[in-house]
């Protein structure tokens, strides 16, 4: 799909290319590099990607790497919901549920897409992790 526009009506090529290259090519190169070095790692996981590309999740789990929830989708930036806290909470909870479903346990951490949490993100994560 074509990158969606960000403020200023500019296509968000940064997030689009991170997602597309990373999920199609980059992850397999990274797995090979870490396999050759014998080093385990952590890997971020967008929920949508986990549902659409389960082979990636399986490859990471087989290596014993830690998967870190990373929003619903790479282009679903939490700051879009700065004025819609109910929607942000919904995105976080939906993401964490997919994580539990595909990884088989609750998440241990979080990394917001584009490293952009809102002022509410930590409270919503605390709420989700400590119900």
Over which residues does each language-model region extend?
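Catalytic alpha-helical scaffold of carbohydrate-active enzymes acting on polysaccharides/glycoconjugates
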Residues: 1-131
């Amino acid at each position: 799909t074509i990158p969606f526009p960000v403020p200023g009506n500019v296509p968000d090529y940064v997030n689009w290319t991170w997602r597309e290259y990373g999920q199609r090519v980059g992850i397999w190169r990274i797995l090979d590099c870490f396999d050759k070095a014998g080093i385990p790692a952590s890997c971020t996981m967008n929920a949508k990607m986990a549902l659409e590309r389960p082979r990636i999740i399986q490859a990471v789990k087989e290596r014993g790497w830690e998967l870190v929830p990373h929003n619903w989708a790479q282009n679903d930036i939490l700051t879009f919901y700065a004025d819609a806290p109910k929607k942000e909470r919904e995105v976080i909870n939906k993401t964490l549920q997919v994580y539990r479903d595909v990884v088989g346990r609750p998440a241990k951490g979080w990394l917001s897409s584009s490293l952009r949490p809102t002022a509410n993100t930590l409270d919503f994560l605390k709420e989700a992790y400590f119900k």
